Amino acid sequence: MKKHLHKLILFSATACLSACTAQEPLTDYVDPRIGTAHSRWFFFTPAAVPFGMAKLAPTTDGHLGNPNGWEAVGYDSRHTSIEGFANFHEFQVGGVVVAPTVGELQTVPGPLDNPDAGYRSRFDKKDEVARPGYYSVLLKDYGVKAELTATERVGFHRYTFPATEEANLIFNIGTRMGESGPVRDASVTYTDDGRIEGWVVTEPAYVDIYQKGATVTMYFSAVLDAEPTAWGAFSGEQTFAGERSRTGVGAGLYLRFDTRERQQVGLKIGLSYTSVENARLNLEKEAAGKDFDRVRREANDTWEEALGRLRVEGGLHDDRVKFYTGLFHALLGRGLASDVNGAYPANDGMVGQIALDGAGRPVHDYYNTDAIWGAYWNLTQLWSIAYPEHDDDWLARQMVAYQDAGRLGDGIACSKYVSGVGTNFTGLAIAAAYNCGIRNFDVALGYQAARKNELGSEGRPAGAGKLDVGKFVSQGYSPYLPELGMQTTPDGSGFAASHTLEYSFSAYAVAQMARQLGHEADYEQLEKLSGGWELLFDPETKYIRPRDHSGEFIADFDPYAAWAGFQEGNAVQYTYYVPHDIDRLVELVGREEFNNRLDSTFLISRESVFGGGKTINAFAGVHAYYNHGNQPNLHISALFNFSGKPWLSQKWMRTICNEFYGTEEIHGYGYGQDED
């Protein structure tokens, strides 16, 4: 039988829960620094509210990234100097950096191994405070205390300076940051009425892959609570004293202040993806009459309410830290991309407008989003159970994106396609929400979009992913074409076997929506496609085995070989990827062999901490028996519940929670695997 997904969710959701009382501040359990030695650009952003656009954090290595991790890391807890504080942190989006300094003016951050060559400053971990909604640190080289907090669309900075005539604020706008890709243009102006305003145009790597020629633009409008004594512009290392504006790659601005001892200089910076004018509007609507301390309190209260929707009982203090820190990170992602007036960045580069209610407020918000690949193990259930209003917004936003571009996008950065792994589970997410009773969106349009995502191959752009879905629909599986490497075409894929498994699962999900809506012919087609995975089941090895373009199983099959037909994994890991038809998988393998194999998988994998061991590398576990450091088989510890030995699910879930997850900067979400 196939109807086990809800049970999987419950077992997965309760495995690591632990105790707290209603009186305890739940934010005290959150440690944003967990896992920050090997995380992505948007992972460490403590100065933010749930799903906010303004995500403020220090950056220690700009866009250089973690050589043994994934994309740009931004903040690496092993580093000892900070180059500034960025205001935008999102998947494939980053920039607008502010840095306080004292003394001789420098306009480039300098390298990690030589902080004195630029304006970056050393810091000590003991001087850091990172909490939900707040961050502070002492910049040792300058004796400046930096503090950050935020509303949804406004970043608040507060810098406490020593007594000096050379207190500086550096606005580094035209320099590459995070996952944003190369800067194509930038502009910053110190206006006559005392605002600092501008924009930066970037070309993220995934945008270049999935929507070539498109760019992402970030806008800002900032106000200060102190008057500078001097100002100037710069372009890289070249400075222009007294100038109020600069445009181009490397553009920036500096302001100089005469400060008394412990004088605070406050900065409010409104953000937008549509225009400077809307950044200014966001600033006025969200920050008018509010000071730093008030916003910090409000941010903390917002986090308390959000975290408090899930209260847990039993267990140890470290379990509570793991649980609420994980929940904190789940609520940070997929931040706002629309303004207070409902303006949003459309896929074609224009500015779209969300409908307004009778009071002139947008009827929903619009979001950036990392890919949904793997989010169906956790986020989609979390949203529907505890944050249904966000699920509503996310679905409404998907409908807008679909109408704008004609296809669903798995990952979206400023409305541009950033599919990530080149598949697309948005149709599954729409169907899942509908099946959970989340229906405050255009259901007919949602079904049309989901159906097209599962069945539509004609004219499919790269950004919509699933380029090989036509083959899956016509013959029930995607052919493995090893010559493609990591690419996918309409003829097949280098990841054909994992695609077949994934498309089978998503077809099943949309089939359930089709049946509920009375689309019986669609239901029958999708239900049949949901069994496509079985075409790849090899009765000899009892593993999922790729088939070539002629329909034959590939020769010289090695079930432990990673990337050979399987994206970020191997046949040993992916064979369990049949969450919609577990009973049939158990039947094909044989119940006793299934249980023995699965139990042995965990026994062996425990030696490598259920992943890639202690190697700091996002893909360290792709060759392993089991890789809890990546999405494809996060669910398999629950499968004993459907093979007659539920106590083994209890045993291995608890062991994974105790040993794979940690409360340290390196040992957090594994020892160095993919934190997503």
Task: Annotate each predicted stretch with a short phrase.
Residues 22-428, 434-501, 508-535, 541-544, ...:
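Accessory carbohydrate-recognition regions in carbohydrate-active enzymes
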Residues 18-19:
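C-terminal motif of bacterial Sec signal peptides marking the signal peptidase cleavage site
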Residues 14-15:
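Short, linear, compositionally biased motifs with a strong N-terminal bias
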Residues 1-9:
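Bacterial N-terminal signal peptides that target proteins for export
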